[in-house]
Amino acid sequence: QLKQQNIMIAKSKAIREARLKESINIIARAMQSGECNHSEGVIRLTMLLMPFGKTLTPYPSMAQLHEIVHNMPTHDARKQLEKKERMRLDLARERAEAKFEHEIKEELRQFLDDIKQIGVI
C-alpha cells in the first residue's frame, strides 16, 4: 500500500515537473517571437522556476526587468487605478522593456539552451 502511494506520488511529481518544463519552454519561445511581452514573460518564468529552486539571476536583464515590473498591479488591482496612474505605470514598463529588449533576446537564447542541456536551469 505505502509502496503504491510512493509510486503514485513520484508519478504525479514527474508529470507536474514535465508540465512546468513545457510551460517554461513555451513562454520563453513566445517571448523570443514577440507573442508574449517581456514583462509578462519574466513574471511567469519566475513563478515557473520557483518549484525547481531556480531564479532568473543568471540572466541579468531578465532579472532586472522582473525587479522593475513584478510589483506593478495587474487585473482588478490595475483596474482600480486612476487612468493617469495606469498610464504612468505603462510608460515605466514599456521604457524598461525597450531598455532591456536586445539583451533579453540574447539571454533567451542562452536560457533555452540551458533548459535543453540540463532539463531546467
PLM features per residue range, with description:
Residues 1-121:
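Acidic, Ser/Pro/Thr-rich low-complexity regulatory regions
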